[in-house]
């Protein structure tokens, strides 16, 4: 699928299977999400630009590769997006963090925005927007609309699960933003949930309903 990368690493798929199980506890779900987010982050950042820097090892000077440019921004769509942040920050602790408060109205399935906080210079940084689920796509589209309004243009979207309907909506709205996901499931049900999915990621992560 154009513009969409499915991260099918065996460890990602193994952990995702355990997360899908309805009997998986809140604590286990949260731990697995942190672990899987590290693996997903590894894949979504594999083509970052590098530059050479002169350093000194205990034995001699050398030219060695280092990340080029300003630090990354991880933009979390609240609240479930925060579950992906911990593992990603373990891997890239110097990253800046943005929070975008968007929730889906369960009657209209439309996004409702209530919070936005991001570095002032986001136009100069690569932004990785994170949300475990790309269902209808409405919340992620609204979040990226907001980032673009603030000048962001180098954006990637990372999720755990995606529905074909959400991918189609997202790609129509933001064809310039690549999507990275661990799996593309069958469809959305009448309530807008991904099927077979894993339930409501935020509720399973925080033990709420």
Swiss-Prot record:
Protein name (record): Uracil phosphoribosyltransferase
Keywords: Allosteric enzyme, Glycosyltransferase, GTP-binding, Magnesium, Nucleotide-binding, Transferase
Organism: Rhizobium rhizogenes (strain K84 / ATCC BAA-868) (Agrobacterium radiobacter)
E.C. number: 2.4.2.9
Enzyme category, top tier: transferase
Binding site for 5-phospho-alpha-D-ribose 1-diphosphate: 79, 104, 131-139, 200
Binding residues annotated for uracil, in chain numbering: 194, 199-201
Family of this protein: Belongs to the UPRTase family.
Pfam families: UPRTase
Superkingdom classification of source: Bacteria
GO terms classed as biological process: UMP salvage; uracil salvage
SUPFAM superfamilies linked to this entry: PRTase-like
Reactions catalysed according to its record: UMP + diphosphate = 5-phospho-alpha-D-ribose 1-diphosphate + uracil
Example GO molecular function: uracil phosphoribosyltransferase activity
Cofactor note: Binds 1 Mg(2+) ion per subunit. The magnesium is bound as Mg-PRPP.
Pathway where it operates: Pyrimidine metabolism; UMP biosynthesis via salvage pathway; UMP from uracil: step 1/1
């Amino acid at each position: 699928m154009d513009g969409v990368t499915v991260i099918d690493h065996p460890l990602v798929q193994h952990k995702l299977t355990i997360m899908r199980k309805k009997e998986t506890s809140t604590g286990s779900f949260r731990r697995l999400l942190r672990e899987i987010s590290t693996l997903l982050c590894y894949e979504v950042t594999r083509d970052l630009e590098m530059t050479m820097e002169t350093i000194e090892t205990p034995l001699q000077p050398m030219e060695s590769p280092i990340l080029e440019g300003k630090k990354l921004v991880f933009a979390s769509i609240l609240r479930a997006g925060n579950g992906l942040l911990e593992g990603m920050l373990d891997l890239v602790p110097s990253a800046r963090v943005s929070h975008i408060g968007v929730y889906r109205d369960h009657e209209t399935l439309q996004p409702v925005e209530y919070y936005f906080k991001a570095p002032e210079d986001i136009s100069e940084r690569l932004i990785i927007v994170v949300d475990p689920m790309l269902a209808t796509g409405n919340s992620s589209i609204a979040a990226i609309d907001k980032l673009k309004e603030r000048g962001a243009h180098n954006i990637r979207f990372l999720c755990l699960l995606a529905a074909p309907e959400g991918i189609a909506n997202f790609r129509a709205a933001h064809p310039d933003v690549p999507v990275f996901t661990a799996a593309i499931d069958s469809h959305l049900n009448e309530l807008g949930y991904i099927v077979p999915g894993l339930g409501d990621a935020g509720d399973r992560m925080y033990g709420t309903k």
